[in-house]
Amino acid sequence: MNLFGFLSLTAILASQTQPLMFSKLIGNGSAKYLIVHADDLGMCHAENEASFKAMEAGLVTSGSVMMPCPWVMEVVEYAKSHPNVDLGIHLTLNSEWKTYRWRPILPPEKVPGLVDPDGYLWRSVEDTLRHASAAEVEAECRAQIQRALSLGLKPTHLDTHMGTVVAKPEFLDVYLKLGKEFGLPVMLPLSMLENGNYTTPPQVKQLLPKVVEAGMPLLDALAGGVKSTEPGERRKEYISLLRALRPGVTQIILHLGTNSDELKAITSSAEARYGDFLAFTHPETRQQIKELGIRLIGWRELAKAFKAK
């Protein structure tokens, strides 16, 4: 083999072992792209109302819907009247709150490992990992996707509530499989697969070759770790995150809520959720994004690149 042939073969082999990055699919790999994402739509009215307002204000570029939750039909109606809204499916395998609970889409007897003794989805990721099989996870996640489609939603992507579908290698396998089956990109950052995160055990890193083999593009990173619940301080922390963004495609995950008795009755994180809403409807945040040269994008743009690859 001559030198040219050797170099060509080396390049081919390298491309087969390197993950496909969204930043390469959508254009300039040196640019800073940011998805500002609203999680937990459908959970309650306060979550929906704040998310809709923030998306209409222009800084929140996408969201995802919890199909088993009580307020999902409000999201369906909103999507009908706002056909350009960028919504994915927030694959939901947990029901974490103390008194406000939801069940799987499938009858509990068909997915017994997913439900607690009261018939609700387990509160913790650890309980789901302990009791549920990959087959049950696949069946329920597929049912959630099919439910969304049957209601007329046009999902742009899949992602995960509480990280459960990426917390175990067998579950991550299901996540990739369903993404390919339904032609939807899945939310996976390279930084998580390389370094782990709060739900991801070390063995998930071993699945990076499977992600490469599946041809599923990756985000570069998730940006998070905001601690303060006081609205002004919370906004400052988000601005610090914006200033620290690196080139590539990064996602910030928000949990937005209105300052309502409903949300306060559901969760102790109500103040932080209202803080997220205030931070990403605030003129200072918009100005910082502009000054930093950050390009806001949504999952619809990534989905188009995914389907065209």
Stretch-by-stretch model annotation:
Residues 5-8, 12-35:
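N-terminal pre-catalytic segment of deacetylase/amide-hydrolase enzymes
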Residues 24-26, 51-57, 74-86, 103-116, ...:
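Acidic (Asp/Glu)-rich catalytic clusters
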Residues 134, 138, 142-212, 216-217, ...:
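Catalytic domains of cell-wall/extracellular-matrix polysaccharide-remodeling enzymes
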Residues 47, 98-101, 197-206, 229-235, ...:
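Histidine/acidic-residue-rich catalytic or RNA/ligand-binding cores of hydrolases
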Residues 25-98:
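Active-site beta->alpha N-cap acidic-glycine motif
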Residues 186-187, 266-309:
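C-terminal domain-boundary segment and adjacent tail
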Residues 33-35, 60-64, 84-90, 155-159, ...:
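Structural preference for beta-strand elements that scaffold enzyme active sites
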Residues 68-69, 80-167, 189-195, 224:
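Metal-dependent polysaccharide deacetylase catalytic core of the NodB/CE4 family, i.e.
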